[in-house]
């Protein structure tokens, strides 16, 4: 009889030990409350080389974190402003908060979203992309940039968050053609753009250097046959109308090489492989 009672007792002891071990394993993943603040290393925003006829690459105004001082960081239903401390080379940054930061509650990954710029009046909502109509000044060009990292997993042992651009970057490289020996002094604008969210339907570009002009736009599609690039030079106004729709996607860079002729514009090449065949001679608008 004693022998029969001993077996269930031993079994019960084994179950108790197993349960205790499982609880300890579960507790081992938890962290003391308020002791491990969430500090994140932010990456992304680098400028990549864009050889002629190559696929589009991620757009970046400066290719670094210079000028970004804080971001809105969302974790769960809460949104807090986090300070941005850029690295020495500005290629990455540390996101931190001194007062009332988020805290790790376990070693499990967390899901966060972050964005810049944000609306101080309502930091809880990511603002719609709305760029400047006149980007001919560097500050207005730079201030038209929007970045974010949406619903990304962040690991406890490697808390890294990669940001991307919410805008598309369009670069126009002018070359003198028949009837012109120089394109210096040209004014370049993007046309036929979407007015969604209060965006401008035309954007005056920034003369980045020499004969290179740039602008940031909201993601959109410019319809085929519509004037897309306008060049004002030597008292004449010239337009480029693509044969196919021009799809401008967030985070992409589109570089067009445009030759200015007395009879119109010729698209010499484009860094977007799927759009390289849209080149055609154009005539000035009547």
State the predicted function of each range.
Residues 278-286:
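A short, hydrophobic C-terminal helix/tail in secreted or cell-surface proteins
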Residues 2-8, 17-279:
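Sec-type signal peptide cleavage vicinity
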């Amino acid at each position: 009889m004693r022998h029969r009672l001993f077996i269930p007792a031993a079994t019960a002891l084994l179950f108790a030990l197993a349960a205790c071990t499982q609880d300890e394993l579960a507790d081992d993943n938890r962290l003391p409350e308020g002791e491990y603040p969430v500090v994140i290393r932010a990456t992304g925003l680098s400028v990549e080389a864009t050889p002629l006829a190559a696929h589009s690459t991620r757009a970046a105004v400066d290719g670094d974190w210079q000028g970004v001082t804080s971001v809105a960081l969302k974790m769960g239903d809460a949104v807090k402003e986090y300070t941005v401390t850029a690295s020495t080379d500005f290629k990455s940054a540390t996101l931190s908060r001194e007062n009332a930061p988020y805290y790790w509650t376990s070693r499990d990954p967390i899901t966060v979203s972050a964005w810049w710029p944000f609306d101080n009046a309502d930091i809880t909502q990511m603002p719609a992309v709305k760029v400047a109509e006149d980007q001919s000044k560097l500050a207005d060009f730079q201030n038209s940039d929007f970045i974010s990292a949406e619903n990304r997993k962040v690991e406890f042992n490697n808390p890294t968050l990669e940001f991307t651009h919410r805008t598309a970057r369009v670069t126009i490289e002018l070359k003198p053609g028949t009837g012109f020996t120089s394109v210096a002094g040209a004014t370049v604008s993007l046309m036929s753009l979407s007015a969604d969210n209060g965006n401008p339907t035309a954007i005056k570009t920034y003369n980045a250097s020499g004969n290179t002009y740039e602008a940031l736009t909201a993601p959109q599609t410019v319809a085929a046959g519509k004037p897309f690039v306008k060049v004002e030079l030597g008292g004449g106004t010239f337009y480029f109308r693509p044969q196919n729709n021009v799809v401008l996607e967030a985070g992409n860079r589109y570089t067009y090489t445009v030759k200015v002729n007395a009879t119109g514009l010729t698209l010499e090449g484009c860094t977007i492989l799927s759009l390289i065949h849209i080149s055609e001679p154009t005539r000035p608008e009547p």
